[in-house]
Amino acid sequence: MKLNELRDHEGATKNRKRIGRGIGSGTGKTGGCGVKGQKSRSGVSLNGFEGGQMPIYRRLPKRGFKNLFAKTYNEVSLGRIQLAVDAGKLNIEKSVDVAALKDAGIIRRFKNGVRLLSDGELKSKIVFNISGASKVARTKIEKVGGQINVPESI
């Protein structure tokens, strides 16, 4: 068998039906939409309309809200930081802050701060100046001789 002899199995592919291309095609004129009514018109139907039945979004109770003042943090794993150190993208001679993480390509868009998570292993002694870290991440950092400095204003 050669590459030019490769074929799909019989019945594996179907030809698509072109709608509204004459009565001989089987899907001409009304194009599978029936006759008259809202659903036969262009623009099809209304989203969430259930034919007069009380729609699901009105049957279910309202819940929760979006807090406009909630602070969101960039979450960075220790393993990701170690990869950047190994690749030479992150300089650990100085303390690591948001600007250093952004320059290394670890975070893209800065949110309200950076939070370290404990995924992966950290082998390098690093001093962090960031918004926060999980308890396990703190213990892992302190275990290798590093430290975390969290600003008072947060």
Swiss-Prot record:
Basic and acidic residues: bias regions: 1-13
Superkingdom classification of source: Bacteria
Keyword Ribonucleoprotein: yes
rRNA-binding as UniProt keyword: yes
Gly residues bias spans: 21-35
A cellular-component GO term for this protein: cytosolic large ribosomal subunit
An MF annotation (GO) of this entry: structural constituent of ribosome
Region of interest (Disordered), residue spans: 1-44
UniProt xrefs under Pfam families: Ribosomal_L27A
GO BP annotations, alphabetical order: translation
Keywords noted in UniProt: Ribonucleoprotein, Ribosomal protein, RNA-binding, rRNA-binding
Subunit structure, as described in the record: Part of the 50S ribosomal subunit.
NCBIfam families: rplO_bact
Biological role: Binds to the 23S rRNA.
Family indicated by similarity: Belongs to the universal ribosomal protein uL15 family.
Protein name in UniProt: Large ribosomal subunit protein uL15
